[in-house]
A protein has these predicted regions:
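Ser/Thr-rich, low-complexity intrinsically disordered terminal regions
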Residues: 20-141
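Bacterial N-terminal signal peptides that target proteins for export
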Residues: 1-8
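C-terminal motif of bacterial Sec signal peptides marking the signal peptidase cleavage site
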Residues: 15-18
Length: 141
């Protein structure tokens, strides 16, 4: 009888562990981390992170985003907009480079909580940001 109980217990554990979820490599985004980082990141030739953050805010507003949070100390800006009735969220971080001669900006966009991996979206954002920084540096408002 004890052998039957042990066999049933072992079979039960096997069935339960078979229902457990497995870790998917996509959860950590291991597929294309380097590719994603390269399309989401640009370096700008200014050491003033606050100017970059102000221009990030202006650029997002120019692109019809509503600023949800902005923290110049941390160098983060979060914004949302509606596109075809769905929510697009963009989070942008700015940090000084290791040499303190440039500022590195990384943008992360989501469409309905799914990451946007279309390079054109990021190219358009960084192009607008670059123009804004140029105009700001040359005192054109």
């Amino acid at each position: 009888m004890n052998l039957l109980k042990i066999a049933l217990f072992t079979a039960g554990l096997t069935l339960i562990s078979g229902c457990a979820t497995t870790h998917d490599a996509r959860i950590l985004g291991a597929d294309n981390q380097v590719e994603s980082r390269s399309m989401q990141t640009r370096s700008f030739d200014t050491s003033d992170k606050n100017i970059v953050i102000r221009n990030v805010i202006s650029t997002l507003q120019d692109l019809s985003f509503v600023i949800d949070k902005a923290d110049t100390d941390l160098g983060t800006v979060s914004a949302t907009r509606l596109y075809n009735g769905n929510k697009v969220r963009m989070t942008v971080t700015a940090r000084s480079s290791s040499t303190n001669k440039s500022t590195i900006v990384r943008a992360n966009a989501q469409y309905n909580l799914k990451p946007i991996d279309n390079p054109k979206i990021y190219q358009d954002f960084f192009s607008s940001l670059s123009k804004s920084l140029f105009l700001s540096a040359n005192a054109v408002e």
